[in-house]
Amino acid sequence: MDAEHFPVGFFRWDQRPAPVVAAAAAPTTTVFNKDHGRPLEVILPMNGRKDLKSLEDLFKEYGVRYVTLAKMTEMGFTANTLVNMTEEEIEDLMKTLVELYHMDLLIGERYGIKSAIRAEKKRLQDSLEMQRLEILSEAERKRILHDDQNTFAAAMASEGTSKELRANDPLIFPESTSADHAPMNIASCKDSTLILQNSNQAQFCGSGLIGVPEHSSESDERKADTNKQKRRRSKEPGEDGEDRPREHPFIVTEPGELARGKKNGLDYLFDLYEQCGKFLLEVQRIAKEKGEKCPTKVTNQVFRHAKHNGAVYINKPKMRHYVHCYALHCLDSEQSNHLRRLYKERGENVGAWRQACYYPLVAIARENNWDIEGIFNRNEKLKIWYVPTKLRQLCHMERSKECQ
């Protein structure tokens, strides 16, 4: 090919000094001359060198020659342009280089261009995902801290209120009666109900009794209609013809505690994972008898086998949703039990407890050189489960912070 079509900066072996007039018009850079031991001024294009440097970074270690990079820069392509192009557009670019500019693209260069662009896209997507997870984790920490502060403030307020009531209201606490505190006139409050039915509508009367506004029959009927509409809406099928997704029927319970009502406890949840391990053994036995490939982890085949055997309460979304909670239960039962007791005392729902189970696992991964995959594979009960994607991403994010 004719070398006159390329910027002079690519031909670093060219030892000819640049003209003085051209050097005054264009920015220069210094290249060391090995033969004469003195610096040599080489002219660089005004707007091509910056783009070229970006292309060098993009295609570094992917086997793309400088001649190809120079021609792509001359055509006006930058690293950002290439990263935002589709596979078809990349094919058109390489076809143009071959047919229109008569360049001999090597096979490795073709795959190198595609691989470099694909890797850069994946890196950008991973970076955005890490930022999103970092924002979510920070928001979760702030929410937990805010809940702790609210709980402490509510406890202090309730303690102060109870002391004030005990001192000032002999009608409620007869043991504190004295001559200075005569029984109050109940009629002074608009409503003398002492039972709190709605904390948002509760008001304190002058002497400490809690007055709750009286609910009219119209408001009761309106609330009843609203509840009926909610129940009717929950029973209606979704837009796609399937049932609407419902919350998993679990509540936070302490170890050994039996759940009451319609929802199950966490011991029942962990027992489901034990049952999945037994169903996996049955699937492996059947596969060996048929001479088929045996699954080593809990896959869709295991869930179908469980459903076929009547275990309809075992399904893939539920088991994948809480697998990291089961991992913490297997790896550090003391920490798992502590979290269960803590969130049970706070009255938190199972969703908040589930989010809190991530952080002890990240700490365990830090102690094991961030080998979360190996931690799962070395445990007899966890090696049949896949590592959750979010747990893997959190470990990667924390590891990146330590490296920085």
Swiss-Prot record:
DNA-binding region(s) in UniProt: 246-250, 315-322, 386-389
GO molecular function, one term: DNA binding
Keywords, alphabetical: Activator, Developmental protein, DNA-binding, Nucleus, Transcription, Transcription regulation
Chief location bin: nucleus
Tissues showing expression: Expressed in both male and female cones, vegetative buds and needles, but not in the roots.
Ranges for region Disordered: 210-251
A GO CC term attached to the entry: nucleus
Cell compartments where the protein resides: Nucleus
Domain of life: Eukaryota
Site feature location: Interaction with DNA: K293, N300, R304, G351
Protein name: Floricaula/leafy-like protein FL1
Organism (species): Pinus radiata (Monterey pine)
The organism's taxonomic lineage, starting at the top: Eukaryota, Viridiplantae, Streptophyta, Embryophyta, Tracheophyta
